[in-house]
């Protein structure tokens, strides 16, 4: 039987990422053959990964890789935020973003078939990571973004990589693009313009806003404050020419009732119309980038800021780790029991 030296164990660990005891056991089983030991560890890793396949992985990191006119944003999930800080996990996320930017796969299946720098597929790398790290590791989603030579990428990660944003802007420069990405990270727009919002979605969101007003009015009534009116509209898509014309007529009637001389109406009406539009585009402000108040200058919307610097947003991608994933909610006792059971089964 071959002697299992510390040097041999170290070599296997460096090649496989396995722990000391796992590496030593594998070498003993295959009589010191490194290649057979790697294959054995891979098989055991696949078995461990299969046991973890039904677990919920809602933590993790985003990764961004930019090269020339191509950028990739990825979300890689783990089960705990502790593992998300693991050096091996961080390296895997960064390598994933790089190979996806270079390979430009169309979907997750194609992405997992890409070859990593180690020579193994991305899927095999995730199986190995699941086995060695001890948690389910999975590629949740990715986006490949491309630009022209005249355009600029804005790449930004926030909160230790939990949020990743890439924007593409026409005009301006990289500094402006990055500022826009910082805004996107903070304000969570889902689309660029109101024209991309679904009509029923706007109606549903408007109903939610008015429900919130009703609740606020209940509190206001208790302290004898006047009730706030319901919002009639929520998006520019609902502000037809007829609606705008009627709003202007209502403002003129209001000014006449207040006794304001007609010769100064032209100075008052534009400001009141701006206020009308602001009050009746709350859904746009929540979900569309261009309608949001710019976080770097709250006197402007993002659209107005971009116009002031002769720039425009072509597209953007924003990933936030775990968004839309329903996390398991266990009490502490159940969590400890589950952890102990998992340890016994591994």
Swiss-Prot record:
- Localization per Swiss-Prot or TrEMBL: Cytoplasm
This entry's Gene Ontology molecular function terms read: translation elongation factor activity
Its primary localisation, in coarse terms, equals cytoplasm
Task: Note down the stretches annotated as region Involved in Mg(2+) ion dislocation from EF-Tu.
Answer: 80-83
Q: Does the keyword Cell inner membrane apply?
A: no
Highest taxon of the source?
Bacteria
Any idea which UniProt keywords this protein has?
Cytoplasm, Elongation factor, Protein biosynthesis
Decide whether keyword Cytoplasm is in the record. Answer: yes
Q: What sections of the sequence does the record tag as coiled-coil?
A: none
**GO cellular-component terms in the record?**
cytoplasm
What the record says about family reads: Belongs to the EF-Ts family.
Q: What does this protein do?
A: Associates with the EF-Tu.GDP complex and induces the exchange of GDP to GTP. It remains bound to the aminoacyl-tRNA.EF-Tu.GTP complex up to the GTP hydrolysis stage on the ribosome.
> What protein is this chain from?
Elongation factor Ts
């Amino acid at each position: 039987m071959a002697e299992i030296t510390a040097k041999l164990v170290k070599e296997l660990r460096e090649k496989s990422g396995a722990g000391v005891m796992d590496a030593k056991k594998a070498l003993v089983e295959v009589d010191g053959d490194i290649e057979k030991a790697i294959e054995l560890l891979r098989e055991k890793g696949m078995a461990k990964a299969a046991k973890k396949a039904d677990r919920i992985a809602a933590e993790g990191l985003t990764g961004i890789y930019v090269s020339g006119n191509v950028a990739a944003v990825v979300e890689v999930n783990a089960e705990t935020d502790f593992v998300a800080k693991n050096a091996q996990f961080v390296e895997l996320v960064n390598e994933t973003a790089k190979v996806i930017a270079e390979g430009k796969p169309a979907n997750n299946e194609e992405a997992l078939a890409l070859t990593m720098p180690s020579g193994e597929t991305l899927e095999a790398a995730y199986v190995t990571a699941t086995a060695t790290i001890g948690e389910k590791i999975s590629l949740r989603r990715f986006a490949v973004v491309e630009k022209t030579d005249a355009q600029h990428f804005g790449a930004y990660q926030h909160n230790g990589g939990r949020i990743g944003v890439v924007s593409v802007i026409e005009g301006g420069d990289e500094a402006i693009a990055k500022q826009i990405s910082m805004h996107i990270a903070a304000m969570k727009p889902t689309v660029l313009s109101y024209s991309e919002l679904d009509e029923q979605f706007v109606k549903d969101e408007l109903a939610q806003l008015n429900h919130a007003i009703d609740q606020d009015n209940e509190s206001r009534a208790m302290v004898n404050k006047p009730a706030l009116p319901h919002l009639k509209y929520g998006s520019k898509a609902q502000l037809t020419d007829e609606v705008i014309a009627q709003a202007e007529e209502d403002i003129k009637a209001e000014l006449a009732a207040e006794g304001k001389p007609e010769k100064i109406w032209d100075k008052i009406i534009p400001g009141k119309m701006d206020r009308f539009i602001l009050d009746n585009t709350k859904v746009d402000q929540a979900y569309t980038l261009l309608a949001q108040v710019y976080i770097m200058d709250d006197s402007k919307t993002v659209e107005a800021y971009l116009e002031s610097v002769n720039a425009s947003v072509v597209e953007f991608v924003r990933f936030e780790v775990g968004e839309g994933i329903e996390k398991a909610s266990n009490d502490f006792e159940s969590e400890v029991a589950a952890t102990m059971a998992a340890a016994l089964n591994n």
